[in-house]
Amino acid sequence: MTKPDFRAERDLRTRGFWPVAGIDEAGRGPLAGPVAAAAVILDPSKLPRGLNDSKQLTPGERDRLYDEILLHASAVAVAFASAAEIDQINIRQATFLAMRRALLALSATPNYVLIDGNDLPPDLCVPAETIIKGDALIASIAAASIIAKVTRDRLMRRVCRLYPAYRFSQHFGYGTKAHLAAIAEHGPCPFHRLSFRPFREA
């Protein structure tokens, strides 16, 4: 299986676009918690070893790469859109919002942005393109996928301490049988997305 590489970023650099940021999200599908987005500008001389789409990595591999990315990347930022914002503006717009927030939070301003997927956020203020399966192809996007996933998972573990009945540390807000059973027994908590099923059907 092909691993993500830095060719797209190098090509953009030869065309005068530098630095280049990769952006990816985590947590579009869960019934609870925020959606997270990360933006990463990698240092081409210090590329993390073993970069891959976060979904293809074990938790231990993700944690190792998370630390390595934070240590060696030129710039890293993570941002969220809350469950309340998701309910107010819908998950698609909330994902765009988190991506814009992450981009603005970078300590360096990129001249080009590569985004996972096929849905380009509006109003980014810098040239950008989407790449389907970008987290499996593009090093900067893969790094962003790891940062977003690990950051969101750690947040949901903290939320679990506030609301232990839902066992968020086991499923991170996704609609597992155990999570649905806890919702049926206890009702929603403030971190649930009330615009999502099963809440809309209650």
Write out the residue ranges for each language-model feature.
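RNase H-like, Mg2+-dependent phosphodiesterase core
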Residues: M1-A202
